[in-house]
Curated annotation (Swiss-Prot):
A zinc finger (C2H2-type) spans 2-29. Keywords: Metal-binding, Zinc, Zinc-finger. One of its GO terms (molecular function) is zinc ion binding. The keyword Hydrolase does not apply. InterPro entries: Znf_C2H2_type. PROSITE patterns: ZINC_FINGER_C2H2_2. The keyword Zinc applies. This is Putative zinc finger protein 012R. Belongs to the IIV-6 302L family.
Length: 373
């Protein structure tokens, strides 16, 4: 399910969500909240407000209404109610609570690209500028830790347009804020930041998303000397572009009226056909990016070379306190073995899909894959 956070509504597909968010009811009312004068409940969304008012049968007294209002405040503030029943007076004390709600996990948001949508996707690939794509990507600090993700369709466009070295630099080296640092030959990755308000309140988080009058005062850096922790955290990236490769490859072969037979004797010929089709449509970078992200040695070697070349660009701001920890970069996926065969969102049925998957697998995994089809 896809949620419109402005209207508190859910939709079965991303296309329906996109259609809804273009409607006047959403665009004109997305920054407005509605408070029911019967029950004092706060409602988001124009349609939700109309439905609530029509169905609400409560009629709270003044004190109950105040309690309901406090309950609403408690969602965003730490509240305390002090009431003097003898004198009929009371006081409400509340203090801001600093919570950050991340976007939904990428794995819960993905749906396979339909053939008719694939045509539109490929058309848009050449339309969007790099500035538009990078702005739409909305990089978060979590793009490093990958416990939660903020990866939009813009990432797929970048993975199709650029080779692996350029893609890695665009995502992690060129952004204004620095997520990597090399100290005494050891690679450190930014893991947490401490922010502060003008009043002096401090809290730790993992995002650069700040409100007005809030500043970053401390950065915590974690060791990743071999870059293997970082590599294992890129599995969501790999899974996303692998499925794009299968969707796009199936669509391109069908568009060229190519049907590959389920015969291992013609593997070499099929590989040449697939490579030529991807080359004709100028999307061979997808194949390279999957190959690099799927190889621990290739990825770590390439990324260390990039960090070395851009070490002068990784200087840290002097107005922030930096703490370098001996702990490894946190990773929920560290040390796990994985295979491209377990990352597909669709069942490989044979023919074109079979050969697309076969030729993207490492040599060592191909015999096992043949036994599963």
């Amino acid at each position: 399910m896809f949620e419109c956070t402005h209207c508190d509504l859910h939709f079965e597909s991303k296309s329906k969500l996109a259609t809804h968010q273009k409607t006047k009811k959403c665009t004109a009312h997305r920054f407005l909240g509605f408070t029911c004068q019967k029950c004092w409940d706060h409602v988001k969304g124009y349609e939700n407000a109309l439905n609530h008012v029509a169905k609400c049968g409560q009629k709270l007294q003044t004190f109950e209404g105040i309690q309901a209002l406090v309950a609403q405040l408690a969602l965003h503030y730490k509240c305390e109610v002090v009431f003097d029943h003898e004198n009929g007076k009371g006081q409400i004390n509340f203090q801001k609570v600093f919570n950050y709600t991340h976007p939904s996990n990428l794995q819960e948001m993905r749906e396979p690209i339909e053939p008719r949508s694939m045509h539109v996707w490929y058309k848009m690939l050449r339309k969007y500028s790099d500035q538009y794509l990078l702005g739409g990507h909305g990089l978060y600090l979590n793009d490093i830790n990958y416990t939660l993700f903020r990866l939009s369709d813009a990432f797929k466009f970048l993975a199709a347009k650029y080779d692996a070295r350029t893609l890695l630099k665009m995502l992690w080296i060129e952004p204004t804020y620095k997520l990597f640092h090399v100290k005494d030959g050891i690679v450190y990755v930014l893991g947490k930041i401490q922010s502060q308000t003008q009043e002096g309140r401090k809290w730790f988080g993992d995002t650069f998303c700040l409100q007005r009058n809030e500043t970053i005062v401390k950065c915590l850096w974690y060791r990743d000397p071999t870059l293997e922790q970082l590599w294992s955290n890129t599995i969501p990236l790999l899974k996303e572009i692998l499925n794009l490769y299968l969707d796009l490859g199936t669509w391109l072969l069908k568009r060229k009226n190519i049907k590959l037979k389920n015969d291992h004797k013609i593997h070499h010929n099929c590989k040449t056909i697939i490579e030529n089709v991807f080359k004709e449509y100028d999307v061979t970078n997808l194949i390279e990016n999957i190959t690099v992200l799927n190889s621990r040695q290739t990825f770590t070697t390439m990324f260390r070379e990039i960090l070395t070349q851009h070490q002068k660009d990784l200087r840290l701001p002097s107005n922030i306190h930096h703490v370098f920890k001996d702990d490894l970069l946190p990773s929920s996926l560290g040390g796990q073995e994985f295979s491209l065969m377990t990352m597909t969102e669709q069942k490989i049925s044979g023919g074109n899909q079979y050969h697309l998957m076969y030729h993207i697998l490492p040599e060592s995994e191909r015999p096992m894959f043949e036994t599963k089809i």
